Amino acid sequence: MSGFAARSLGAQLGKMAEWFPVVSLTGPRQSGKSTLVKHAFPDYSYVTLEDPQIRRAALEDPVSFIRNRSERLIIDEAQYAPNLFSMIQVVSDERGTSGQYVLTGSQNFLMMKSIGQSLAGRVGLLKLLPFSFLELKDWQGERADVDEFIIKGGYPRLHATGMPPAVYFPSYIDTYIERDVAGLLDVRNKTAFHTMLAICAQCVSNLQNTSTLSKDVGVSAATIKSWLSVLESSYLVFTLQPYHSNGKKRLTKSPKLFFYDTGLLCYLLGIESVEQLVESPHFGAIFENLVVTETMKRHLNEGARPELYFYRDDSKREIDLLDFTDASHPWAVEIKSSRTYHDKYARHLQTVCDEIGIGREGRCVVARVESSFETEACSVVAVQDWLGWR
């Protein structure tokens, strides 16, 4: 499939350029950042620091690099030349206008470090993840299928070329390790890093246990923590923090681990077909990952900062997802991969929600049912409706 696929974040990108002198767009490699900024700002000059010669010029003479270029400039993979950021500050302050620079980056840690040192208060921050199901449906029409989307994920090149995930992801992972991981860490044992990535896939939607990962991979707990931080910084995985209230209930302190893209997750688990997906012992965890990640994308694409948590206490009461992004309308969401709804799915919603202040209108179970409906306890939302919510 060819042609530009409109991204939901496009409107927010334009607003940020009206409000700030600098706009930063971060996200994983190949999520569509370069395509989006070129389409959103067609009159801007464009340079990419992936080019070794351009990167060298930026590192050796940042003053000339900035002053000799257009007032409207896109700098792709800007994290490769952190010394540019102080010069961008000087020049943007001199001009005093909005929308001067658009910076993209695949390494959030390096980008935010440079922004924090030089551009604090001058930059509008946005994140672009791979396609959401809603974006893909808008592009493909009714052909978009939830189960197929889980297996393929949302990386644009996969959908633009029709490339099989089993061909795309090995190259993606190898490139990621060579360019991003090697640039931040001394990863001498690449086999161990691959092993950790595969084990993370097996632990998805579960509590993160650094000690267990350390034993399974055969490296120190400190190394695991360092590697996980890089996976998070480069938008491969993220953690959902447990919800904490002021009550006396003992709540878990460990976060849960998720992947930003279910296609990568399924590849690491060896899942290549819908049949393998629904028969997999990991299907429930993968489905939970889908709903959590797509909820996050929805908020990010609206320019909001997601406030997502999970609930688990010592009474073994658990709610898969708490969404406080809109403080006036919080959500408590149980996530079930079943095609049939059972009342037991909502058994913790009433008691926990009464305690933490989420009303009946915010209580729901997202499942693979054919259509959404209401029960006395909660709303039962078909996954296609949850993913397609505007």
Model regions: which residues?
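N-terminal pre-Walker A segment at the start of P-loop NTPase domains
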Residues: M1-G14
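Short regulatory helix/loop adjacent to the ATP-binding pocket of P-loop NTPases
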Residues: F109-G124, Q140
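Hydrophobic anchor at the beta1->P-loop junction of P-loop NTPases
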Residues: L25
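Hydrophobic positions on the alpha1 helix immediately C-terminal to the Walker A/P-loop
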Residues: L36
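Conserved lysine of the Walker
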Residues: K33
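Conserved catalytic/switch belt of AAA+ P-loop NTPases
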Residues: F85-L103, Q107, Q117
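Domain-level recognition of nuclease-like catalytic cores that cleave nucleotide substrates
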Residues: R368-R390
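Accessory nucleic acid-recognition modules appended to NTPase machines
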Residues: M163-P330
